[in-house]
Amino acid sequence: MNYLEGTIDFAGQLRCQKYMNYGLCTSAVISYIYGYLVQDSYCVIKLFLILASLVALVCLPAWSMYNKNPLKFQKKKE
């Protein structure tokens, strides 16, 4: 499978969107709590960027887990 091609099915798109939404919200909450505990806003930004990069690593490439239910097209009628 070519990872740069970006072929994922509709169920994979939904799964990827859920991972992205939950991952970014969780990253924001963790970053905020950590920044509150250390009383440093720079740490909030730095930790959020690190965690958002990890979420991007999970969501952006076309992993095979996002293409488990490919569409089956009908054959061309002649």
UniProtKB/Swiss-Prot annotation:
Residues 1-18, 64-78 are cytoplasmic. InterPro entries: Spc1/SPCS1. GO terms for cellular component: signal peptidase complex. One of its GO terms (biological process) is protein targeting to ER. It is a multi-pass membrane protein. Disulfide bonds: none annotated. Pfam families: SPC12. The chain crosses the membrane at residues 19-38, 43-63. It is found in: Endoplasmic reticulum membrane. The keyword Ribosomal protein does not apply. Its main location: endoplasmic reticulum. Keywords: Endoplasmic reticulum, Membrane, Transmembrane, Transmembrane helix. Belongs to the SPCS1 family. Component of the signal peptidase complex (SPC) which catalyzes the cleavage of N-terminal signal sequences from nascent proteins as they are translocated into the lumen of the endoplasmic reticulum. Dispensable for SPC enzymatic activity. Component of the signal peptidase complex (SPC) composed of a catalytic subunit sec11 and three accessory subunits spc1, spc2 and spc3. The complex induces a local thinning of the ER membrane which is used to measure the length of the signal peptide (SP) h-region of protein substrates. This ensures the selectivity of the complex towards h-regions shorter than 18-20 amino acids. SPC associates with the translocon complex. This is Signal peptidase complex subunit 1. It comes from Schizosaccharomyces pombe (strain 972 / ATCC 24843). The gene is spc1.
